């Protein structure tokens, strides 16, 4: 006779009990997942939306992180030099692999509702790193002397997405229309 120990990763008080709320948590989780997965697919295959040249074409063609790290980083931000220095010179660079795997992992994990703790925290860290690189609070003085500033110097889509990811993790959103229940019953608690 074997005993099964149930190890819920979400406390009963944190679970969503409303069926409508469960469905909407799943919809938001899947939509956020598709946002990450689309970014991966467009950068990997050069689908012609945000990325013209595919990463998979090899040397000299697509470099998914170089453009953002060289030109998208706010030059007035306190960490501009750090982020500019991370830009890989080759498509095979470590930062490209790390970034692309993070996008793929976030997209697949969120869409399927797998490993929500790791997926949500990892995705939030990725988004907050991009927020730091963009430094929306730092105004940019252009060559002609005009000042360019973001619409909101503190809260932008990176903050909203990060907060939403943490909320989805806390309410166990992977359990609804996802494989979260199965995942939780087959993996150690720290992997939930």
Residue ranges and their predicted role:
Residues 1-105, 112-192:
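Extended, low-polarity transmembrane helix blocks
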């Amino acid at each position: 006779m074997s005993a099964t120990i149930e190890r819920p990763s979400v406390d009963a008080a944190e679970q969503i009990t409303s069926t409508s709320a469960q469905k909407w948590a799943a919809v938001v989780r899947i939509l956020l997942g598709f946002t990450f997965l689309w970014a991966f697919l467009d950068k990997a295959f050069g689908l012609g939306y945000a990325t013209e040249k595919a990463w998979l074409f090899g040397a000299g063609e697509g470099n998914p992180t170089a453009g953002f790290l060289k030109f998208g980083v706010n030059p007035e931000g306190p960490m501009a030099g750090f982020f500019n220095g991370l830009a890989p010179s080759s498509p095979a660079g470590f930062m490209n692999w790390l970034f692309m795997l993070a996008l793929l992992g976030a997209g697949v994990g969120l869409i399927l509702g797998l490993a929500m703790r790791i997926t949500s925290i990892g995705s939030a860290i990725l988004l907050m790193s991009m927020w730091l690189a963009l430094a929306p609070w730092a105004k940019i003085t252009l060559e002609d002397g005009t000042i360019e500033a973001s619409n909101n110097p503190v809260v932008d889509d990176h903050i909203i997405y990060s907060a939403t990811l943490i909320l989805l993790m806390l309410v166990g959103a992977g359990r609804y229309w996802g494989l979260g229940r199965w995942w939780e019953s087959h993996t150690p608690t720290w992997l939930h």
